UniProtKB/Swiss-Prot annotation:
It is found in: Cytoplasm. GO terms for biological process: removal of superoxide radicals. FAD binds at residues 31-39, 281-290. Keywords: Cytoplasm, Disulfide bond, FAD, Flavoprotein, NADP, Oxidoreductase, Redox-active center. This is Thioredoxin reductase. The active site is a redox-active disulfide bond. InterPro entries: FAD/NAD-bd_sf, FAD/NAD-binding_dom, Ferredoxin-NADP_redctase_2, Pyr_nucl-diS_OxRdtase_2_AS, Thioredox_Rdtase. The lineage of its organism: Bacteria, Pseudomonadati, Campylobacterota, Epsilonproteobacteria, Campylobacterales. Signal peptide: none annotated. The gene is trxB.
Amino acid sequence: MIDCAIIGGGPAGLSAGLYATRGGVKNAVLFEKGMPGGQITGSSEIENYPGVKEVVSGLDFMQPWQEQCFRFGLKHEMTAIQRVSKKGSHFVILAEDGKTFEAKSVIIATGGSPKRTGIKGESEYWGKGVSTCATCDGFFYKNKEVAVLGGGDTAVEEAIYLANICKKVYLIHRRDGFRCAPITLEHAKNNSKIEFLTPYVVEEIKGDASGVSSLSIKNTATNEKRELVVPGLFIFVGYDVNNAVLKQEDNSMLCECDEYGSIVVDFSMKTNVQGLFAAGDIRIFAPKQVVCAASDGATAALSVISYLEHH
């Protein structure tokens, strides 16, 4: 039987594996179908991880993690997981190929991904001017003009954040009304650096080999079209958490989740199910930063060590 099963191989999962194995967990297994690394491997530049002074790509950044985290005995099972369920005091893990595993404890570190819009040019310029993380990429646009797309809390909050760095922020939303907290909207409207463009949609993201150069936008009320010259577009139209592994045969969820499907945990990354932990972007209130996901993974592993000692 597996002592600790880790579902997901991003920064949270890898950190959990490192801390679990170094902490004496004899049989720790990481379940990740492909090479571990997580969605950060798709990032073109990382410069906000403490201790890493050079600007590196996400792929280069995560490569040493794999080597270090497997050095202490973490095993890698290259298979996708379909479902995790509880059977008595242990867990049953069903892989997509039908194979089953049993584990004393489980850390869910499956992460999530920002929703995409399908706008023409979005895929082409993803990571080359199109971003979903103002904290990660905002600094690259210091004293430049950028656009933010979205009408919820995250979009408006990130527009305010970017206004502290950028020369100007265009906040684009398809409706006149916003879904964010009124006080947040008020702060944005009182910020002279933020210009509201409503009701507008982005029809195309344009650019060249160096990245985004402009946006084609259209007013949905008047059909007026205009070109917005900006080197960056930040998209905040929602976030999908990868919680499918929690869904049971009767369609219930293995543990408590919030309205968005994120796993409810306490400060030690424990869920409401004994022996089940969660770390990284899958958990509630996740800051969605690599350094935070790594911290979560370490915390979850320490909680697992304590759990295994007493069970």
